[in-house]
């Protein structure tokens, strides 16, 4: 089985969206396009709004990804865990799909004999190590996120360091919502490292509403733009299709 490119959206927020399209619907659209949507809800003072929590879970479920509610001080390890878990889940889904084609509709990794299952798990681990990864990060910069942004910045830098220890190539892009003039603003174009976030984040002025749906919509457009450009240049890539 050949390695392909894993595509993820990582949404970091602390509450409920209050403008624009339904974010869960946009996450479902992302899943249809082979993009996994992971959501991390950042808590403060032991609480997170109940409607916000429901929305976080709904977005991740619709996007075939992982959701996690976390205190800001545990954000760094959570960002890494969620990203890696989603990678493994996507690859397992693809492997299960291939097993069904080879062995029949009811076959899956869990139903294989222990020795064969061990071999498949090794394949999944290897693919997680060598597959290319594209992560588009959406950071909520509404007013309530003001004191959490320094932690978000450090967590994303730690994420790029951790993932760059893999063999496979990584590309990250960072968008914020709301932006200065629009609902969404690109902060950082595709790059293998996120070190430059230190300077960029220090200039951010959090405030305003939480247009999560429009932010996800813009993320999809950005992925499609990248894919179209590669196709036009004759360098189209293989992408993992969501098979979960």
Short names for language-model regions:
Residues 66-75:
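Short acidic-hydrophobic, aromatic-tinged amphipathic segments that line or gate anion-handling sites
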Residues 2-6, 13-62, 70, 240:
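VWA/integrin I-like adhesion module and closely mimicked acidic/polar interface patches used
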Residues 47-57, 171-203, 222-223, 228-232:
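Short beta-strand-loop
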Residues 148-152, 208-220:
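Phosphate/oxyanion-binding active-site loops and adjacent basic polyanion-contact surfaces
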Residues 16, 142, 146, 202-206:
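Second-shell loop/turn segments in exported
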Residues 81-136, 143-148:
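Acidic, polar low-complexity linker/tail segments
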Residues 8-12, 130-189:
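Von Willebrand factor
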């Amino acid at each position: 089985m050949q390695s392909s490119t894993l595509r993820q959206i990582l949404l970091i927020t602390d509450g409920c969206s209050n403008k624009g399209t339904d974010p869960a619907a946009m996450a479902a659209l992302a899943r249809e396009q082979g993009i996994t949507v992971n959501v991390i809800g950042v808590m403060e003072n032991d609480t997170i709004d109940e409607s916000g929590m429901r929305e976080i879970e709904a977005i991740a479920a619709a996007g075939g990804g992982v959701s996690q509610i976390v205190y800001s001080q545990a954000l760094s390890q959570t960002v890494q865990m969620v990203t890696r878990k989603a990678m493994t889940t996507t690859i397992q889904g693809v492997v299960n799909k291939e097993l069904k084609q080879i062995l029949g509709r009811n076959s899956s990794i869990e139903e294989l004999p222990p020795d064969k299952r061990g071999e498949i798990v090794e394949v999944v681990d290897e693919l997680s190590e060598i597959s290319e990864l594209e992560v588009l990060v959406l950071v909520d910069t509404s007013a309530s996120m003001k004191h959490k942004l320094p932690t978000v910045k450090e967590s994303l830098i730690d994420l790029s360091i951790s993932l760059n220890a893999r063999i496979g190539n990584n590309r990250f892009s960072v968008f914020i919502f709301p932006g200065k003039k629009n609902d969404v603003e690109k902060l950082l174009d595709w790059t293998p490292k996120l070190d430059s976030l230190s300077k960029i984040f220090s200039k951010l002025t959090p405030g305003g509403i939480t247009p999560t749906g429009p932010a996800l919509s813009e993320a999809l457009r950005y992925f499609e733009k990248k894919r179209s450009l590669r196709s036009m240049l004759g360098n189209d890539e293989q992408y993992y299709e969501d098979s979960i």
